[in-house]
């Protein structure tokens, strides 16, 4: 059976694994998911990620990051633009999750960027997710 929203599935796997204090989480691989993982690693929300060969296709293994006392790096993660209702924002109306404490992942013509990078470049796009 095909999955309706693989990005929401990825975000849910990350949220659930983080809440359950798992060290790693596996998910089906795609370039879009890899780009999201790159942003999460660059912003300090995950420790690392690798693409591994599976029985069928590839899987993306994400190593989660925790604080010195076991506190989660990803406190919350929310899918914004969905297949049934796409959400777009111009460069002058980009969201600032939690007043700038979180990040918004934006899909632009220049690839996936955070809202801060979009503001610097003056471009808008589709709001994929909020992470805080």
From Swiss-Prot:
GO MF annotation terms: rRNA binding; structural constituent of ribosome
Chain's role: One of the primary rRNA binding proteins, it binds directly to 16S rRNA central domain where it helps coordinate assembly of the platform of the 30S subunit.
HAMAP family linked: Ribosomal_uS8_B
Keywords: Ribonucleoprotein, Ribosomal protein, RNA-binding, rRNA-binding
Matching NCBIfam families: PRK00136.1 (NF001109)
Species in which this protein is naturally found: Bifidobacterium animalis subsp. lactis (strain AD011)
Name the record gives this protein: Small ribosomal subunit protein uS8
Example GO biological process: translation
GO cellular component: ribonucleoprotein complex; ribosome
Similarity comment: family membership: Belongs to the universal ribosomal protein uS8 family.
Pfam families named among the record's database cross-references: Ribosomal_S8
Subunit-structure text: Part of the 30S ribosomal subunit. Contacts proteins S5 and S12.
Keyword RNA-binding tagged: yes
InterPro entries recorded: Ribosomal_uS8, Ribosomal_uS8_sf
